[in-house]
């Protein structure tokens, strides 16, 4: 099955502490989760790695969110939208269901 949310898509968070925030998808995990820039920030205690010249300390980084808790953002309507698939010129493309515009 094709992925409805892909890397570099702009998404909006539907539920949780970051509800309503928008961000760009950095990574889509095979476990049904996505990592979104600036969303679901957690503090991680990191040990120093002298070989890589990395200092230790408390680092803020993005944690994964369930893909069902985000929706693709439609810039034309300014709202969250659903994704559909159709074939054009023998290629499968994604489109917004609200206004039938192709995605990228």
Curated annotation (Swiss-Prot):
One of its GO terms (molecular function) is structural constituent of ribosome. Pfam families: KOW (PF00467), ribosomal_L24 (PF17136). Disulfide bonds: none annotated. Keywords: Ribonucleoprotein, Ribosomal protein, RNA-binding, rRNA-binding. One of its GO terms (biological process) is translation. InterPro entries: KOW, Rib_uL2_dom2, Ribosomal_uL24, Ribosomal_uL24_CS, Ribosomal_uL24_KOW, Translation_prot_SH3-like_sf. It comes from the Bacteria. SMART domains: KOW (SM00739). PANTHER family: MITOCHONDRIAL RIBOSOMAL PROTEIN L24. Belongs to the universal ribosomal protein uL24 family. One of two assembly initiator proteins, it binds directly to the 5'-end of the 23S rRNA, where it nucleates assembly of the 50S subunit. One of the proteins that surrounds the polypeptide exit tunnel on the outside of the subunit. Part of the 50S ribosomal subunit. This is Large ribosomal subunit protein uL24.
């Amino acid at each position: 099955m094709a992925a409805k949310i892909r890397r570099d898509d702009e998404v909006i968070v539907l539920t949780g502490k970051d509800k309503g925030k928008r961000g760009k998808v950095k990574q889509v995990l095979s476990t049904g989760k996505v990592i979104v820039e600036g969303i679901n920030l957690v503090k991680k205690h990191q040990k120093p790695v002298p070989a890589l010249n990395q200092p230790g300390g408390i680092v803020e980084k993005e944690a994964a969110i369930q893909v069902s808790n985000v929706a693709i953002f439609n810039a034309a309507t300014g709202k969250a939208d659903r994704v559909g698939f159709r074939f054009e010129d023998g290629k499968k493309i994604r489109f917004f269901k609200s206004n039938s515009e192709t995605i990228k």
